[in-house]
């Protein structure tokens, strides 16, 4: 009734340029017709069976540099302090009320992750100030619309202070949502049958490789418990591993009925 392909990637974290993304590009060129994808992300917070991911928020990172004019703190009129300017900009960014969330997604949120003013002297106004921020956004926005909004603020404040700025953006993925259908409900039923838990449909958490796969087919995410992921002594339960194997087998059998 069909065929199955298994993709294992060794480049899933960070920029993820040499893994799933390149396979998806290859499949597009080959015009391979794929109907569905199940991604084995650790979707469950505490117990196997708690959660299926039906979408993910987008992720936009920005690295901002403000160029000022170095000088002595006793003579501020002879300098231009980029620290003051970057603080004003970051406050404006944090004050943005992007949205209130949707039925499927949490509200869009911006977090400042780095502030760097490379200045070892206490009595010198620095020449450069830098900051990094990240936005996790829902499907009310695109990375393009968010960049336009932020750039307006940057231009306005820089013009006011007669300063120069540089901003570098990196998009890890756009927000996406797989609308629940008969395949979703079948997977829910299989999980409940084996774990005795009916999984919640969720879009919480970070990005995943489904952000690439969604370009060629719909998909969901379901895997192990992620309680210890990215921690020292990361581990999973052997019982969970056996039950997940049963779940995957049942899903395949039901899908090809």
Question: Which residues make up each language-model segment?
Answer:
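Acidic/histidine-rich catalytic neighborhood of metal-dependent amide-processing enzymes
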Residues: 1-55
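Metal-dependent amide/peptide-bond hydrolase catalytic core
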Residues: 42-47, 54, 60-257
